[in-house]
């Protein structure tokens, strides 16, 4: 159908899943020159969850998706599309999203992955919003899921203590809105990338290298960019929605580090 600007993509259900294995900071003290106080002070992180053998990004994502379906009171085939934000898909292809589709018993619609790492969930949310506003889908499942424990360099204390495994999901549905900031749903989106900064945060493996690779990061540089860019993109999104900072009650940033937040 044609784009109706008073249509809104509204969250009607959400769910999450965390693997059962919990690793406290102290567990790293045996193998790394680090300690609980050091990790807490620099990151705010106290513990993380790691996937167990047999768990993959798609199984974590499926568990979160099922929780979101339960929350919304829907069945898998009520969903038109699944968009899964991940940088740690089970395989090179097919997409982890299609694996979730199969695990949910979903027999219709379409599914694909979005790879934008830290910003992935917001990119996927933006995709879902566009599908709904353009009339291509009525209900979209958006999932963010990672198994970063499988791309860690366990000898690098500056990175391996920061990341964990888990999944979160929301279901968006088309609803009529007024086109004003009083509406429920997604009011505005702002996306940005800058490929020139690749060397600040990347994985040194992939199809071109024949390896899975490990995460590499220039932490202090990432910190500097994150603080400035997060504030700038939030300001742009607020301007587009016609709201001021005073109107906002709750900000949910990427929770990599308490000092960035």
Question: Which residues does each PLM region occupy?
Answer:
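Condensing-enzyme catalytic core mediating Claisen C-C bond formation in acyl metabolism
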Residues: 4-53, 156-228, 232-236
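Buried hydrophobic positions in well-ordered alpha/beta secondary-structure cores of metabolic enzymes
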Residues: 11-13, 39, 68, 82, ...
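Acidic, glycine-rich active-site loops and adjacent beta-strand->loop/helix elements
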Residues: 16-17, 85-90, 116-121, 144-149, ...
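Conserved catalytic cysteine-centered active-site region
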Residues: 38-59, 86-140
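Phosphate/pyrophosphate-binding loops at sites that engage ATP/ADP/AMP, CoA/4′-phosphopantetheine
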Residues: 64-80, 232-249
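Glycine-rich phosphate-binding loops at beta-strand->alpha-helix junctions
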Residues: 85-91, 248-260
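Flexible, glycine-rich active-site loops centered on histidine and acidic residues
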Residues: 133-166
């Amino acid at each position: 159908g044609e784009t109706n600007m008073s249509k809104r993509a509204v969250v009607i259900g959400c769910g999450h899943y965390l693997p059962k294995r919990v690793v406290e900071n102290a567990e790293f003290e045996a193998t790394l020159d680090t300690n609980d106080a050091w990790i807490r002070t620099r990151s705010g992180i106290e513990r993380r969850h790691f996937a167990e053998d047999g768990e993959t990004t798609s199984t974590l994502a499926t568990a979160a998706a099922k929780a979101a379906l339960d929350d919304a009171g829907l069945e898998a085939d009520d969903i038109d599309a699944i968009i899964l934000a991940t940088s740690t898909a089970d395989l090179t292809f097919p997409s982890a999203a299609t694996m979730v589709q199969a695990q949910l018993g979903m027999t219709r619609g379409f599914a694909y992955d979005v790879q934008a790492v830290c910003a992935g969930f917001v990119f996927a949310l933006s995709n879902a919003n566009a599908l709904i506003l353009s009339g291509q889908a009525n209900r979209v499942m958006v999932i963010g899921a990672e198994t970063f424990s499988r791309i860690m360099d366990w000898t690098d204390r500056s990175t391996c203590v920061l990341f964990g495994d888990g999944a979160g999901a929301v279901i968006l549905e088309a609803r009529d809105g007024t086109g004003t900031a009083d509406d429920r749903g997604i009011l505005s989106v702002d996306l940005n990338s800058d490929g020139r900064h690749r060397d600040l945060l990347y994985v040194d493996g992939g199809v071109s290298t024949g390896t899975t690779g490990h995460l590499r990061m220039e932490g202090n540089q990432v910190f500097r960019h994150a603080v400035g860019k997060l504030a700038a993109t939030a300001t742009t999104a607020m301007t587009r929605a016609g709201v001021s900072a005073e109107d906002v009650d709750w900000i949910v940033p990427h929770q990599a580090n308490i000092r960035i937040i």
